[in-house]
Amino acid sequence: MIVRDLQEILGTDREVTGEGWTSRRLLLKKDGMGFSFHETIIAAGTEHLFWYKNHLEAVYCVAGNGTIEDLATGQVHRIKNGVLYALNNHDRHVLRGGTEDMRLICAFNPPVTGRETHDSDGSYELVEE
């Protein structure tokens, strides 16, 4: 059994910060669950281009608000507490923070190792342990 307290992750290498976002990686590939599990904070008023071409991601909003734009279709969807979106087609998208920080709970498949960073097109490379 794995039990982790978010407070124990803060300030460690499992808390990764970029411009306008913070990802707290609660489960990683080495945990052997077949997916990774993160809490991600998107700062209010920020905009991020992401394209997880090597990963599938499901995201559930538990606080805050913003939008996600599907760059293939131009559709913009509102995100708020209680909304889930799943990037089931490796969807290239723009995530925009709204009037308050968004707190998102995310699952990635394949799981990330914790060493990934976004590259120039907004994706994560596949990293082996």
From Swiss-Prot:
The enzyme's E.C. designation: 4.2.1.108
One Gene Ontology MF term: ectoine synthase activity
Cleaved signal peptide residues: none
Group of enzyme by EC: lyase
UniProt catalytic activity: (2S)-4-acetamido-2-aminobutanoate = L-ectoine + H2O
GO biological process: ectoine biosynthetic process
Pathway: Amine and polyamine biosynthesis; ectoine biosynthesis; L-ectoine from L-aspartate 4-semialdehyde: step 3/3
Family matches, as InterPro entries: Ectoine_synth, RmlC-like_jellyroll, RmlC_Cupin_sf
Keywords on record: Lyase
Keyword presence, Oxidoreductase: no
Pfam families: Ectoine_synth (PF06339)
Family membership noted in the UniProt record: Belongs to the ectoine synthase family.
Cited function: Catalyzes the circularization of gamma-N-acetyl-alpha,gamma-diaminobutyric acid (ADABA) to ectoine (1,4,5,6-tetrahydro-2-methyl-4-pyrimidine carboxylic acid), which is an excellent osmoprotectant.
HAMAP family: Ectoine_synth
Protein name: L-ectoine synthase
